[in-house]
Amino acid sequence: MEEFQRYIELDRSWQYNFFYPLIFQEYIYGFAYDHGLNKSILLENAGDKKYSLLIVKRLITRMYQQNHLSLSANHSNQNDFFGHKHKKNLYYQIISEGFAVIVEIPFSLLLISYLEAKEKKIVKSHNLQSIHSIFPFFEDKFLHLNFLLEILIPYPIHLEILVQTLRYWVKDASSLHLLRFFLYEYRNWNSLITPQKSISFFSKRNQRLFLFLYNFYVCEYESIFLFLCNQSSHLRSTSFGALLERIYFYGKLEYLVKVKTFTNTQDFRVILWLFKDPFLHYVRYRGKSILASKGTSLLMHKWKYYLINFWQCHFSLWSQPRRIYINRLSKHSLDFMGFFSSVRLNSSVVRSQMVENSFLIDNPIKKFDTIVRIIPLVGSLAKAKFCTVLGHPISKSVWTDLLDSDIIDRFGRICRNLSHYYSGSSRKKSLYRIKYILRLSCARTLARKHKSTVRAFLKRLGSEFLEEFFTEEEKVLSLILPRDSSISRGLYRGPFWYLDIICIHDLANYE
């Protein structure tokens, strides 16, 4: 426990105490709205889209008055001291954007110091910024693992939890009080949290501030959780001495620092602390995380209930056990970042000849397989009006006013982006269907614009129309290798993982 406390104090050594005066500085709101500092955006007596720093100060003052807070609960007309309620919401948004800039200052400084320290090292890992780098990691590690925990990170039930988490880093009590008043004063803040969704529950109107608070909450959770993981992979269980995992124990004897004869249960429990699990891996994207291990089912159940108690004790959150799933990798497909990932066995039969006898040896080989979730992806295309819910291409009527080159460029860019992201799929047939939908939807859009048929339009455009829908890797491979070669066919069918993808395409982001 003392070591844990020292770790917390070390990581929180950068604490800032003087943020509150920055809230009343005009240039902060200039930074928030990306305006030049030589042009004031907070002017009195301007239009509805112009802001007044004086009114912002008055709003902050009013939020500290208890009678004003009591009136806001009843939605009284007297509470609308701006004359128009939509203006009041506008100024709440201004304060949230400005406050987001202020609370990001210490973490921006931490990031700068981290990057400066990183530049001094020889080894650089810029490619790890790509979200595609997760899947080569899966291919390398998951073949040797047995179980995984699929964890839906619980969202804060109350925004007060976010404020309390932030107070460990920001010691400016005035700023924290203002943030707390602001969250309570904003009349629609209860609607910002939707229980049915994980990370998309925050209001788009105050996205920067609330996403910062949520990301900070996740960072706080991961910093403590991963520290505990590094200390010991085995969770000591004093009340379940009869359920010690003997198989797992004998498999890990090589990782003991010192082996000695166990004379009693107490000695055994002490030596158990020496075990380290080198096969415990943690991955997260947005509100979903994966904890994979080579351990047994009993060990994974220990982790599950440990996480539930951890959230309950540290964050006062009650996480339902069904938000954490325990699955065996050999029997379950992992639904993560738009892919179905699984470990399947490929049978390799080898014939062995010994004198007059011959044998057939069946060698099962594990392979990491990734396929595209085609049904949700077609649903996203249907929602964007590229096809029907059954996958039949339709024209994009809202684009018929554009130039032909712009229409083709838009469809081609969407097709290339989706193919770029889903290039890691082990089976390309799903991607061919998506290309077919977008290509025919483009043809129908152009034919509708020119009041012609699709057949006649495709005949007039010829092969040049299809070139817009070639993906980058297809163009490169077609220049290097002929399509009829065996090497080229294997590369066309194999997965491609790119190291320049930092986010999921909007059409692929259907979670």
UniProtKB/Swiss-Prot annotation:
Organism: Maihuenia poeppigii
GO CC term (a single one): chloroplast
GO MF terms, alphabetically ordered: RNA binding
A single BP term in Gene Ontology: tRNA processing
Lineage summary: Eukaryota, Viridiplantae, Streptophyta, Embryophyta, Tracheophyta
Localization terms from the record: Plastid, Chloroplast
Main location: plastid
The family this protein is said to belong to: Belongs to the intron maturase 2 family. MatK subfamily.
Pfam families: Intron_maturas2, MatK_N
PANTHER family according to UniProt: MATURASE K (PTHR34811:SF1)
Function text: Usually encoded in the trnK tRNA gene intron. Probably assists in splicing its own and other chloroplast group II introns.
The name this protein goes by in its record: Maturase K
Annotated HAMAP family: MatK
Keywords: Chloroplast, mRNA processing, Plastid, RNA-binding, tRNA processing
